[in-house]
Amino acid sequence: MAPVSPTDFPQQCHGAVVGLGGNIGPVLDNLQGAIAELALVAGIEVERCSSWYRSRAFGPPQPDYINGCVTLRVSLSPPELLQTLLAIEQKFGRIRLEKWGPRTLDLDLIFYGDRQLEQARLTIPHPQMQYRPFVLVPLAEIAPDWVDPRSGKTIIQLIEQVDCTAVWPVAPGLELGGSLEPEQVFAPGAVAVHG
């Protein structure tokens, strides 16, 4: 695919999906804090948040992950949105040492409207999302009819193709309505998840 620059995307709103996850530290506090940070960014409106789900980690032995998804309305370009996500990860102590290693916070840009994009640092839709029940299960909760532009399949159709038995709900999602204030989202220690 041809390189894309931020100027290739006009300043209009697009739907986007971000997957959130983590498995070390105060995971739910970090996930909810990340949503609060997203809500503070000009050009981002948080629309819906899924419930939180526990799943086994890939890679080396490590704690289970807690994952969820949010739908957004954004006027940022895909590269700008990616930079925002990386900055929020850093703010919550994300250190990139090993692939599939433990992390305080992981934010993945899953969809950006119906766009397909392939760059060195960004591929949209996320190249592995259709194989990941920890993405598909929460996404089916909040956007079951979202269509993967690569396959033409809805999230519901994609979820039927993966084994979801190792994904368990652990906490309700955030109730979002009207304009989102950070204090509505982030109440440290408000929800505890026990092993």
Curated annotation (Swiss-Prot):
Its EC number is 2.7.6.3. Disulfide bonds: none annotated. Pfam families: HPPK (PF01288). One of its GO terms (biological process) is folic acid biosynthetic process. PROSITE patterns: HPPK. The keyword ATP-binding applies. The keyword Kinase applies. It comes from the Bacteria. One of its GO terms (molecular function) is kinase activity. SUPFAM superfamilies: 6-hydroxymethyl-7,8-dihydropterin pyrophosphokinase, HPPK. Pathway: Cofactor biosynthesis; tetrahydrofolate biosynthesis; 2-amino-4-hydroxy-6-hydroxymethyl-7,8-dihydropteridine diphosphate from 7,8-dihydroneopterin triphosphate: step 4/4. It catalyses: 6-hydroxymethyl-7,8-dihydropterin + ATP = (7,8-dihydropterin-6-yl)methyl diphosphate + AMP + H(+). Gene3D superfamilies: 7,8-Dihydro-6-hydroxymethylpterin-pyrophosphokinase HPPK. Keywords: ATP-binding, Folate biosynthesis, Kinase, Nucleotide-binding, Transferase. PANTHER family: 2-AMINO-4-HYDROXY-6-HYDROXYMETHYLDIHYDROPTERIDINE PYROPHOSPHOKINASE. Belongs to the HPPK family. Catalyzes the transfer of pyrophosphate from adenosine triphosphate (ATP) to 6-hydroxymethyl-7,8-dihydropterin, an enzymatic step in folate biosynthesis pathway. This is 2-amino-4-hydroxy-6-hydroxymethyldihydropteridine pyrophosphokinase. The gene is folK.
